[in-house]
Amino acid sequence: MNAVAKIEQHNPIGTDGFEFVEFTAPDAKGIEQLRQLFNMMGFTETAKHRSKEVFLFQQNDINIVLNGSPTGHVHEFALKHGPSACAMAFRVKNASQAAAYAESQGAKLVGSHANFGELNIPSLEGIGGSLLYLVDRYGDRSIYDVDFEFIEGRSANDNSVGLTYIDHLTHNVKRGQMDVWSGFYERIANFREIRYFDIEGKLTGLFSRAMTAPCGKIRIPINESADDTSQIEEFIREYHGEGIQHIALTTDDIYATVRKLRDNGVKFMSTPDTYYEKVDTRVAGHGEPLEQLRELNLLIDGAPGDDGILLQIFTDTVIGPIFFEIIQRKGNQGFGEGNFKALFESIEEDQIRRGVI
C-alpha cells in the first residue's frame, strides 16, 4: 500500500501519483545499456509502442518508459544531456482540464508528437526542458493499452526485486532557481513545502526544499547549490543543465531488495564506517539489526515511537549523473534529513578524492 504524506488541501488538477518516468539516450548502445540497467533493477520489459522505438518496463506500480526515438524532442534532449530522464508523468483526474488549468497558471504547453490513432497526452515544459505529462485513465483502458503492444507471456513482476512505487523524484536546479521551480509546482497544482534543509559539508553546501502535491503521493525535493563546487553544481555541469537528480523507489523489505539488486550487479554508494558507530545514539531504540545495516550500507533515520523510521540507500550514478534511491518507510514520512549531512559528506569526500573540489 502506498505510503502518502497526509495533505489536505485543494487539488486543482486532481493529482493522484506518478504515472511513469521516461528515460532516453542518444544512440542505440545507450538505449541498450538502459535496458540492461532496468532488467538489473527488477523491471520486466512488458510492451513496445505500436509505431515508435519506445518500450515499457514495469514492476508493481512503477512504470518506466524507455524512448529510443531517433528524431523529435526526446532525441534532441538526449543529444544535449546524454543518457537522461527526459520526462515524468502525473496521474490526474482529467488530463485536458488539468492542462488548461496549468496553462492558465503560467505553464507552457508543449505541442503533441502523437501520430494518427495515438493518444494525445497533454505535456508541459518541465525542469531543464524535460516534459511533464498529465495522464488520466481514459475509462477502462490505460494509456499503455492504446499505444503499446504487450509481449505475450510477460508480466510486470517476472523479475521483481520487491520495488513497489515511486516515492519521490528529486530535481537539481541552478542557484537562484529553487524558488522558481517550487513556485511552478505551487501554481500549477497547489504543491506545498513540507521540508526545508540547509546542508553544509566540509567545503560545500546545498539547500533543499521538498514539495508535495495535495494528493500526498507526488513528492518533489528541489536542490540548489550554495556555492560553485558542490555536487549539485557538478551534476548541472555534467548533465548540461538542470534536471532530475534521482528517483526514489519504495520497498516493503529493503534488506531483501538490496541483496537481490546487488546479486543482479547494481552498485551502491558506500557509507563511511563511522556512520554506524553513531546510529544507536542518533536513532535510539530503532530496533534494526545494526550489522545488517552496516553489511548492506543502509542508512537509517527518524524517531522510533514518535514519527517512526525510514531506511534508505542510494545507487551509484547509473544514467549519466542520475542515480536511484531505494527506501522503506516504517511510519516516517521524511526524506532522511538526518542522513543528508552524512551522505553529503560521503559524496563530497569522493569529489575531493577525484580532485573536483
Swiss-Prot record:
GO molecular function: 4-hydroxyphenylpyruvate dioxygenase activity; metal ion binding
Top-level class of the enzyme under EC nomenclature: oxidoreductase
NCBIfam families in UniProt: 4HPPD (TIGR01263)
Keyword hit for Metal-binding: yes
GO biological process, one term: tyrosine catabolic process
Gene source species: Pseudomonas aeruginosa (strain ATCC 15692 / DSM 22644 / CIP 104116 / JCM 14847 / LMG 12228 / 1C / PRS 101 / PAO1)
Name used for this protein in its record: 4-hydroxyphenylpyruvate dioxygenase
Residues that bind Fe cation: 168, 246, 325
